[in-house]
């Protein structure tokens, strides 16, 4: 009887110590994820200016080289119960078209012909990408972040500042759509960050790092899972020349590189550790350089996202540039821009072209910077 009692006592103590060890590991991982030890030091690549702060969010951007335009989604804050106008606008990057100094920094809002779409009032655009055909046709693909109508919307630019709504793809698996990367006409990848859309359930999911995120592929007729069991996938970008898909992970603070096969299946090539949480990804078509809009201090970002209406709560912003070397398996990372959140809070999108950089934010303004300090870019 004494031997059985001793064995039971040992088992109980063993279970207790294992439980303490697991809790300690969880707390340690949580502390690392929260970035409690990080600070942000402000710097810019050149003179910067605010293009607009009239909308609660400029969360997504895409560059159409044939038009010299950056298309921008407006009003993401409405998905977090902020009162704001939503829509799509564009910014002209061409500075030699005879416009005045003031006109060079204007945003032009687009009108949308919804063609009878039933839920047009629930349109909250966030992630956006584009496709340009050889005959000059430009298509836009936009994610709707409305909590009850998460869909992918298909548009065609029919006039200079008008959009024609073609269709919408919705699916029960769309719980927290984040970003979109187009690989062909009506062929695209999207990231779904988590099993839960928001709230404490999503926070718990991130804390446990359960890996419920996914990348979905739409081939023009049906939806399929391209990559599963991902931890908080966010921004996504496609390098058409190398056929590489880049997927950011907010919690792992890294970028995954996938080779896109001819049948559009994905093969994981490598993971690039960033030590910051990537939110938006932009790939330069000419160089293949990767530009990343990031949240460098995740606990401040989490507080900002749970209190977006509070103007006194900011989240730092950071832009990284990754230059992939010729051999393709090494890279150089620089930081062209960083801000403590006072100028632009929670950077979520970035575009670079013609020595101009545009930075969008989750709930606030759109920033434009001229890149004149080449030594930091």
Curated annotation (Swiss-Prot):
The chain crosses the membrane at residues 14-34. Glycans are attached at residue 94. Residues 35-377 are extracellular. Glycosylated. Expressed in neurons including the six touch receptors, ventral cord motor neurons, HSN, PVD, PVC, IL1, and several neurons near the nerve ring, in the anal ganglion and in the male tail sensory rays, in muscles including the body wall, vulval, intestinal, anal depressor and sphincter muscles, and in the excretory canal. Belongs to the paraoxonase family. Subunit of an amiloride-sensitive cation channel (degenerin channel complex) permeable for sodium, potassium, lithium and N-methylglucamine, and required for mechanosensory transduction (touch sensitivity). Interacts with degenerin channel proteins and stabilizes the channel. Plays a role in mechanosensory transduction (touch sensitivity). This is Mechanosensory abnormality protein 6. The gene is mec-6.
């Amino acid at each position: 009887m004494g031997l059985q009692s001793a064995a039971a006592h040992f088992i109980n103590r063993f279970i207790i110590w294992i439980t303490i060890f697991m809790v300690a590991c969880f707390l340690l991982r949580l502390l690392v994820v929260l970035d409690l030890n990080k600070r942000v030091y402000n710097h810019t690549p050149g003179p910067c200016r605010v293009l607009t702060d009239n909308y609660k969010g400029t969360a997504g951007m895409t560059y159409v080289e044939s038009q010299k335009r950056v298309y921008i989604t407006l009003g993401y804050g409405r998905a977090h119960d902020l009162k704001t106008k939503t829509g799509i606008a564009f910014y002209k990057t061409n500075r030699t078209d005879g416009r005045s100094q003031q006109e060079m920094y204007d945003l032009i809002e687009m009108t949308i012909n919804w063609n009878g779409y039933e839920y047009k009032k629930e349109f909250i655009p966030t992630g956006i990408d584009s496709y340009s055909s050889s005959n000059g046709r430009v298509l836009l693909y936009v994610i709707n972040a409305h909590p009850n109508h998460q869909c992918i919307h298909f548009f065609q630019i029919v006039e200079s500042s008008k959009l024609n709504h073609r269709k919408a793809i919705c699916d029960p698996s769309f719980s927290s759509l984040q970003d979109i990367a187009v690989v062909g006409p009506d062929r695209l990848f999207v990231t779904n960050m988590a099993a839960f859309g928001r709230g404490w359930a999503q926070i718990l999911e991130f804390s446990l790092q359960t890996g419920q995120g996914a990348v979905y592929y739409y081939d023009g007729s049906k939806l399929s899972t391209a990559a599963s069991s991902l931890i908080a996938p966010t921004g996504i970008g496609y390098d058409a020349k190398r056929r590489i898909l880049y997927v950011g992970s907010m919690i792992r603070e890294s970028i995954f590189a996938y080779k896109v096969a001819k049948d559009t299946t994905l093969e994981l090539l490598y993971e690039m550790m960033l030590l910051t949480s990537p939110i938006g990804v932009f790939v330069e078509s000419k160089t293949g350089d990767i530009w990343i809009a990031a949240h460098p201090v995740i606990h401040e970002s989490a507080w900002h996202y749970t209190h977006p209406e509070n103007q006194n709560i900011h989240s730092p912003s950071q832009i990284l540039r990754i230059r992939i070397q010729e051999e393709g398996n090494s890279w150089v990372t620089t930081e062209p821009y960083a801000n403590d959140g006072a100028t632009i809070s929670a950077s979520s999108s970035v575009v670079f072209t013609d020595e101009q950089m545009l930075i969008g934010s989750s709930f606030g303004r759109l920033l434009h910077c001229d890149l004149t300090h080449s030594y930091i870019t």
